[in-house]
Amino acid sequence: MAVENEGVLLVLSSPSGAGKTTILERLLERSTNLVRSVSMTTRKPRPGEINGKDYFFVTKKEFHELCEAGQMLEYARVFENFYGIPKSFIEQNLSSGISVLLSIDWQGAFHLFELMREKVISVFILPPSMEELRLRLQKRNSDSASEIEHRLAEAQKEMSKRDKYDYVVINDDIDKSVEEISSILDKERLKRSGV
């Protein structure tokens, strides 16, 4: 049985371009008892991203040293870079009754399921169609045509994992998707508090 005031991990996964980041930002605006986990990555920052807010940007050497020291809850290689979740951030928030929102790929989610399934609420976000996903990726203007094709191929693989998640949300309307995931979080918090 979960401690009454213990937080939960809300895991959001999706193919690149499905709207996960926008949904994450809107969920954080709505809730005072929810924080975003800041992941660590070896990839280069995108325009407008801030170190310590969007990600902790580190070198591959620094990343591997932290992993070897056991300071990552989970980590995975995605394309040519590494992503990981610092362990202490999660533990401190959960024990304080604050839920943590994680935006991670399916590999990281599956690892968390193994480590702490009883604390995880998982949601896979789908685009309304592959054509819509292509359009969203093109609108970003951050990837070449070949990178977009690679992301679309990876999206097919990622979407095949959706049945392992607690919930699946089709993001064809951002406001409805945010409302649906917010309701899921409220329902799961109530269930886990024994109310």
Curated annotation (Swiss-Prot):
Lineage of the species this protein comes from: Bacteria, Pseudomonadati, Pseudomonadota, Alphaproteobacteria, Rickettsiales
GO MF annotations, alphabetized: ATP binding; guanylate kinase activity
Membrane-spanning parts: none
Function in brief: Essential for recycling GMP and indirectly, cGMP.
Domain Guanylate kinase-like: from-to ranges: 7-186
Binding site for ATP: S14, P15, S16, G17, A18, G19, K20, T21
Listed name of the protein: Guanylate kinase
UniProt-listed PANTHER family: GUANYLATE KINASE, GUANYLATE KINASE-RELATED
Keyword presence, Transferase: yes
UniProt GO cellular component terms: cytosol
Annotated localization: Cytoplasm
Cross-referenced SMART domains: GuKc
EC primary class: transferase
